Amino acid sequence: SNPSSMELQDLIAGGRLVHTAMADLAVRLTDKEQLVGKSGWSAIGAVVGATHPEDLKSLREKYPNIFFLVPGYGAQGGKAKDVQYAFDRFGHGAIVNSSRGIMCAWKKTEDATGRNYQAAEQAEAERMRDDICRYVTIL
């Protein structure tokens, strides 16, 4: 979700992309320290931006046991159809974050005073959930 992230994450280190090297390290640490719990998910996760759906898809395929935090949905341009790739076939394995989209939802209300920010935030969080659930089935 950070436009300049490629300046570091897409550098080549040891013959591979830095972001791939980091994910490989997470897998090695998970295996070495036996950090996969009963759920099947590693205790070590990765942050993968919603605005890079092609990366979400390839990283989910390559790292099926790494939990993803997915920032960038909403205000930063990530869409529900993009974040669907962060989840496994059961709709598990990711948390989609939309801080600004939810915190600033009151600005889109009729009075835009912020007096009813809680209702606006709840409505936006529910809209986000429903939007994502159009693309992700949770089993």
Enumerate the predicted regions with their spans.
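C-terminal helical cap(s) of enzyme catalytic domains, especially alpha/beta-barrels
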Residues: 83-89, 104-139
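Conserved anion-binding
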Residues: 1-45
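Structural alpha-beta junctions
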Residues: 31-33, 66-69, 139
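Short, low-complexity, polar/charged sequence segments that are solvent-exposed and flexible
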Residues: 14-18, 65-68, 87-90, 114-118
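Glycine-rich, positively charged active-site loop/lid region within alpha/beta enzyme cores that binds
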Residues: 2-10, 96-97, 101-102, 106-108
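A C-terminal functional module that forms or caps the active site or interfaces directly
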Residues: 46, 50-97, 101-105
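Generic structural signal for well-ordered alpha-helices
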Residues: 19, 23-27, 56, 80, ...
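Surface-exposed amphipathic alpha-helices with a cationic face
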Residues: 27-31, 38, 59-63, 129, ...
